[in-house]
């Protein structure tokens, strides 16, 4: 069983001062590894969505959102998928229900496994199950050797 200690923070701390720097994970005490998984609603870079030019500035691909995501990584976290596949294109986890987006693979990668840097080398694979339907997102899976 893992126990996570989270430091109480005021809302403005993140908005004005970035992520706390007193530990590699910001507000979570060492030395326990951390894995964050879920829909973060941000495409981190142009490679993470089909149409970056027409979506620049839109929710999920604004400069501010992308900068905050980058701050998270700089605070001691790793994007597990990009760690293994830095140049892979067309790998998406969300598609609009409109315009046959999923059929045409016109999607966004907005679902993530984020790990603390200390366990990034234990990540074996990250898989997107784009063939599983039932949502506008697909299930994602990470194989990690802890």
Give the ranges of each region predicted by the language model.
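Active-site regions of metal-assisted phosphoester/phosphodiester hydrolases
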Residues: 1-146
């Amino acid at each position: 069983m893992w126990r996570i200690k989270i430091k109480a923070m005021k809302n403005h701390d993140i908005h004005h001062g970035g992520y706390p720097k007193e530990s590699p994970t910001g507000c979570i005490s060492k030395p326990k590894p951390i894995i964050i998984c879920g829909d973060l609603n941000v495409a981190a870079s142009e490679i993470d969505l089909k149409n970056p030019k027409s979506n620049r500035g839109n929710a999920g691909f604004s400069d501010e959102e992308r900068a905050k995501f980058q701050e998270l990584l700089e605070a001691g976290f790793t994007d597990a998928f990009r760690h293994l596949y830095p140049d892979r294109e067309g790998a998406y986890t969300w598609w609009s229900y409109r315009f046959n987006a999923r059929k045409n693979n016109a999607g966004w990668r907005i679902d993530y496994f984020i790990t603390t840097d200390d366990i990034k080398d234990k990540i074996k694979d990250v898989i997107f199950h784009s063939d599983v339907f039932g949502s506008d997102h697909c299930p994602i899976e990470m194989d990690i050797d802890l």
